[in-house]
């Protein structure tokens, strides 16, 4: 098999986005659009990927580190000029080169593989990826002769009335014989209104040299959707989300209302898990089998075990074991590690907390910088007081401990195994194993005193 190369065009400034963020770094379902493109290319056994960068080059290189080589286009002088910047890396090499736009996040590896195969079958020097759309206004048209052979690409503004009625368009993705590409690029002129060097002119140069130019027509226009403004970004995100959600449903996940469920592309979900409407699953979240995530929940970069029930709660950068009940309205902040068979109830917040197997935090609890053992019960209103205004400190609770309601554990403090903390206590010293910790003022009843108080009656 001949060598394969790819050039990704990612140097455009994207002024229509009206954003400080470099255009191709705008995310589509949790991943920058240019990274979608490069990740798809990486599955094609490509020998080298060269990304042409311009504005925001450093940020693009950060995101694609290890996935691509980079060449900077100092001046944005058109698509042909952009590809020519890869001359030092690719010119003179045998093989074929894919040219793909970095702002087409929906393009799939299977389509590019089909393009490469068609290019090889036709023994072409260039093959254009095309598609047919109802309204081709603004797109370059593919002009074929009576035998269906490609004659040229005509830009919309230069097309005759007859040519404007053609619905087959140039998607901006190409496959070239690598040597022929770079030889032709040297002859591209900028004799046009914009004074730029355009890649479609390579097609004309090759045709004028009697080289074979082919066109592979793909089924779906959506793969070629280029993102140039926020409206197109929203459309691309919508189409990508539908693709992601349908893939999860095909793999055994129930999405009660897919249209209102947001799932990033790197999220993994196990079979027979049910995701209710209004759920957001972000980053590299992994959810096991047989879970339920109810409406209003957000889970970000977290690992969730099997048979977990998350009720209208937020989980960030945390780990949850099997058979755990969470919520409603719980908040697991980063570095929470919740073991199996734990109950995290309503209005419970954890942060940098390890919660041992079988432990119950039923409601209105804060546990930050805490290590909690197995089979512990923490009463309503209890707090691990971890911050003294300058420093954070740790609370350690052993196994089989009972913490009464409205208890304050002033860190650093350790509560031993099987200890009992009396309700309303403020614990400032360690509590030994099997001990009762109690720290509250003695109750004093003032008999008859209430008669002197004004109760408003």
UniProtKB/Swiss-Prot annotation:
Cofactor descriptive note: Binds 1 Mg(2+) ion per subunit.
Q: Where does Mg(2+) bind?
A: 103, 228
Query: Which Pfam families does the record cross-reference, listed alphabetically?
Result: Hexapep, NTP_transferase
Name the Gene Ontology biological process terms. cell morphogenesis; cell wall organization; lipid A biosynthetic process; peptidoglycan biosynthetic process; regulation of cell shape; UDP-N-acetylglucosamine biosynthetic process
- The active site of this protein is located at 363 (proton acceptor)
- Where acetyl-CoA binds, per the record, is at 386-387, 423, 440
Reactions catalysed, semicolon-separated, are: alpha-D-glucosamine 1-phosphate + acetyl-CoA = N-acetyl-alpha-D-glucosamine 1-phosphate + CoA + H(+); N-acetyl-alpha-D-glucosamine 1-phosphate + UTP + H(+) = UDP-N-acetyl-alpha-D-glucosamine + diphosphate
Q: What is this protein called?
A: Bifunctional protein GlmU
Q: Which organism is it from?
A: Listeria monocytogenes serotype 4a (strain HCC23)
- Originating gene: glmU
């Amino acid at each position: 098999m001949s060598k394969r190369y790819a050039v990704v065009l990612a140097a455009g400034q994207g002024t229509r986005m009206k954003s400080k963020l470099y255009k191709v770094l705008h995310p589509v379902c949790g991943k920058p659009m240019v990274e979608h493109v490069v990740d798809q290319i990486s599955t094609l056994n490509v020998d080298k990927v060269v990304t042409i960068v311009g504005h925001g080059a450093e940020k693009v290189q950060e995101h694609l580190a290890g996935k691509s080589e980079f060449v900077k286009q100092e001046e944005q002088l058109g698509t042909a000029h952009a590809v020519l910047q890869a001359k030092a890396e690719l010119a003179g090499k045998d093989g074929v080169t894919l040219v793909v736009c970095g702002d087409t996040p929906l393009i799939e590896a299977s389509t590019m593989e089909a393009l490469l195969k068609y290019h090889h079958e036709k023994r072409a020097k260039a093959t254009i990826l095309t598609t047919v759309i109802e309204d081709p206004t603004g797109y370059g048209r593919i002009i074929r002769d009576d035998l269906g052979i490609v004659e040229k690409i005509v830009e919309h503004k230069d097309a005759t009335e007859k040519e404007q009625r053609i619905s087959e368009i140039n998607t901006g993705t190409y496959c070239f014989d690598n040597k022929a590409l770079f030889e032709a690029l040297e002859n591209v002129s900028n004799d046009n209104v914009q004074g730029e060097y355009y890649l479609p002119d390579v097609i004309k140069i090759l045709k004028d040299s009697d080289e074979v130019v082919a066109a592979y027509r793909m089924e779906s226009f959506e793969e070629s959707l280029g993102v140039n403004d926020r409206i197109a970004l929203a459309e691309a995100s919508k189409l990508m989300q539908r693709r992601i959600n349908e893939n999860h449903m095909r793999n055994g996940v129930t999405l009660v209302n897919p249209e209102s469920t947001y799932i990033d592309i790197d999220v993994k979900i196990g079979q027979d898990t049910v995701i209710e409407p209004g759920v957001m699953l972000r980053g590299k979240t992994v959810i096991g089998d047989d879970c339920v995530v109810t409406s209003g929940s957000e889970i970000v970069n977290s690992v969730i075990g099997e048979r977990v029930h998350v009720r209208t709660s937020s989980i960030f950068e945390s780990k949850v074991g099997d058979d755990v009940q969470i919520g409603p309205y719980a908040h697991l902040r980063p570095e929470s590690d919740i073991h199996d068979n734990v109950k995290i109830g309503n209005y419970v917040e954890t942060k940098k907390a390890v919660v041992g197997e079988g432990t119950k935090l039923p409601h209105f609890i804060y546990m930050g910088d805490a290590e909690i053992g197995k089979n512990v019960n923490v009463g309503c209103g209890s707090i691990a007081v971890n911050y003294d205004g300058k420093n954070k400190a740790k609370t350690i609770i052993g196994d089989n401990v009972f913490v009464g309601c409205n208890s304050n554990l002033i860190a650093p403090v350790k509560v031993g195994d099987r200890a009992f903390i009396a309700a309303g206590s403020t614990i400032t010293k360690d509590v030994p194993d099997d001990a009762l910790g109690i720290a509250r003022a003695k109750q004093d009843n003032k008999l008859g005193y209430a008669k002197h108080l004004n109760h408003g009656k």
